[in-house]
Amino acid sequence: PVANLHVIAVNKNDALQFHRPVNGARAYLAVYGGFEIEKWLGSGSTNLKIKAGGFHGRRLNKSDELPFKCRNDFSALLNKKEFRVLPWLADTSFPDDSKEILVLPGNEWDRLTVTSKEMFASTPFVVTKQSDRMGYRLGNNPLSAVSTEGLVSSAVGFGTIQLLPDGKLIVLMADHQTTGGYPRIGHVITAHHSRLAQLKTGDGIWFRLTDQQTAEELLLKQNQHLLQLQNACTFRLQQYLQKHGY
């Protein structure tokens, strides 16, 4: 079994097993040096709809072999029991652990009625079954706009929140289109994209409006935290290998 936040050493034919998810919807498995996979538009993610990226643009199947970018032979240490699971945990704690999703007002925010604006900031929304990597459709009491006249298709991005004709909302995700004609009432800040990605069907979302300065500060803090985590993991691994004469 593979526990969260641990560094483990594996040998050929070892089987890794994960327990059921407790928090979130997705787990991340990293290997030393990274996987040697096909990149598409600068990403190693797999787009199943157009069969691009990742491993031949498809889901992984039993017996698939993913090559590594960097091969390291730790076999001399694998016989030592204490080397199988290294005695330290990656610290992924982050000061900003709120469950709220911060949003910047979109171009058409002011087209919402006063009541709809209040509902957006005070009512929880629910991720519905009609959700995928292109977008999350949300279950909510219908919101309404004063007017949608004069709208033309405009640029959208990861985290754009659009108001659909039935008053429901959709939050665009990683595989979003590039333009959209529905009102863009808001944009989820970049630092909270990962929170969105961990939501699953039935999960609630609480939105809160913020400003550009706060969004930039949170993104900077997040990037610094991830860089520190990466450097700490590299340092601890090198330190452990040196200690064992490798």
What kind of region is each of these model predictions?
Residues 1-246:
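Conserved "landmark" site that anchors the functional core of diverse proteins
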